[in-house]
Amino acid sequence: VLLVGCCLGVVMNLGGYYGIEEADAVNEYRPAGYAWSTTVQDNPAVALHLMENQSYWRYDSLVNEPINSPMLLDVYGTGYFFSLNNSYLSSLFRELGQNTPVEYDYRGLQNRTPLETLFGVKYALCAPDSTGALPALFDSQAVQAAEIGGSTVAVYPNTAALPIGYTAQNQISRETYDALTPLQKQDALLDGVVLEETGLLPEAELTGDTVSPAAEMELDGVQQLDETTYYAPQDGGRITLTIAQPVADCETAFVVQGMQYTATSPLDAMSEEELSAMSAHDRRNLQKQYAHFWRKDSVYLRLLSNIGEGRIEYNRPNSQYYCGRHDFVYNFGTSDEPLQQITIVLPFAGYYQFDRLAVECQKLDAVAARAENLGAENLQNVTLGTNSLGGKITTTRSSVLVVQLPYSTGWSVTVDGTPAQVLRADTAFLGVALEPGSHTVAFTYKTPGLTAGAALSAAGVVLLAAIWAVPALRKKSKKRRK
């Protein structure tokens, strides 16, 4: 009886797990080779390996590709999924209001033209029928195209991409930089380099052309309690900004700064009369629906405008994914008509706080020229190893060489064989000061704490051996005495 019961239980579990009308686990299995074909063989980024230009550059992607494609295909990209993310890179993206609610998952630079230039994005993957989505300074003429995974993928060049190592002759103080809005910051980085040290270079004159047109606000289902706080008693409240004098011929973005959200149950907005008028059944269903409302740990803003739609996601402090982000930029890109009106839909009831809601427009006319100025004196004969980067450069003025690799205290640098100070440039990148002349620069990376860790490990092994050996020696000594 026990054996029959056991066998019957196994059969029932198998049916529940693999049955088509049950869990249907079989449907989750894939044939052998599926992972390889999906992540490598049919990866759109394979088109990059067909390029003649195999120097050091990054690419961005406007097509769907597997997570961590740059790592899988040994190319340099702008997207990655990595839990142990470089904290300085996270700080830079936070300053720039990158529209990503978590620190470890980045999917490109969201077509922000100045960032594509500053990060050395030389190429973009895009479907030939979607070139209208390319950032402004990308050429619409593809330099490479291929049939991959049943679809055509093309590679389009950026006409203003900076090289991996470029020089700045002026610096921006941390105080000046921090006082700027996210779009003004990305604009300013084209005029100089942000350094933590002071007095290394002359102060930069910011020449960017970022404007925030005045907008009239209209509320629908939302109450403004003070200058920064808005209360939505029910789901779906709306804040509409109408721009009287729209700005044309620019890259347009919607900027949110200082966002916070406090959840309240829609039941709180209902009067006793409204609840009493409902049937007991409907009242119980409503109470059940909002029973766990207070557990909400994230919220989003839906954006509706005359030039497109968008979405901004925000994780509250009680979320396991909260990472201190309160500023966000949604880039609408460039369009034939200017942004005239945008509606922010508040999906859930509650208190929303915004230090700033604004539309910002950045003129791109001078971006290419400013990038050309930064890249005029750049690192040549670049060699990039596993833990090193080197090259030669000639400068005509006192400059800071900015290298587009994430900063870490593990980096050291020599200039003409002499150790020099590694600077933290633009919050997240490597830098080194150079005097006029021709120089050989070599950066070397060593994991911070590696030597101390190895020494402690060796000491632990010796101590373990001693703990094992001492009793054995004592035992042997006692035997000899006997």
Q: What is each stretch, according to the model?
A:
Residues 212-482:
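Active-site-proximal, structured, solvent-exposed surfaces of multi-pass membrane proteins
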